[in-house]
Regions:
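N-terminal loops that bind phosphate or other acidic moieties
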Residues: 3-150, 154-166
């Protein structure tokens, strides 16, 4: 007996029809898209003889790295690139998204831990100022609703820097 085909029949008499892959990133290693593509590639190889299966990949995020990409991938929004300050007030290229009338802002891209070397991390100096700069940029474009992902922030000031920047 072929175990692989038996397991497929257990799930659905005709084999899998639709497979949804929705993984978060592997922090510091692979993005959500890369994880999903690796799994999809493995499934296609494993199930090569069943061309009727449809594999759907959805980018996911816990609100940290990859949140903006996940939203823009799923909702077909606009990516906006600006200059803003990181958590140590250094100028960086930053981006946020606009989906319909809502700005999608990922703190990890502006004031995130990954942007600061471990020896430079200092919660007493880190600020979310650049997040406020993104919000103001979106406001000037007519956006009035904002969704912010707070995971992986290098700050501990509860958004005070961002509010001050606005």
């Amino acid at each position: 007996m072929d175990r692989k085909n038996d397991s497929l029949r257990l799930m659905d008499g005709a084999g899998y029809k639709k497979i949804i892959i929705a993984c978060d990133s592997y922090k510091g290693c692979l993005t959500s898209r890369e994880v999903n593509e690796a799994i999809a590639s493995g499934l296609k190889e494993w199930n090569a003889e069943d061309a009727s299966s449809e594999i759907i990949t959805l980018e996911m995020s816990d609100g940290g790295e990859g949140m903006l990409d996940a939203f823009l991938s799923a909702m077909k929004g606009e990516r906006v690139r600006i200059h803003a300050h990181d958590a140590l007030m250094r100028w960086i290229e930053a981006e946020y998204g606009i989906v319909d009338d809502t700005a999608i802002i990922e703190i990890a891209q502006t004031a995130g831990l990954a942007l600061i070397e471990p020896e430079q991390r200092n919660p007493m100096k880190a600020t979310s100022w650049g997040v406020g700069e993104k919000m103001m940029n979106a406001y000037r474009r007519g956006v009035r609703d904002v969704l912010v992902g707070f995971a992986r922030s290098a700050t501990s000031e509860s958004g005070q820097g961002g509010l001050t920047a606005m």
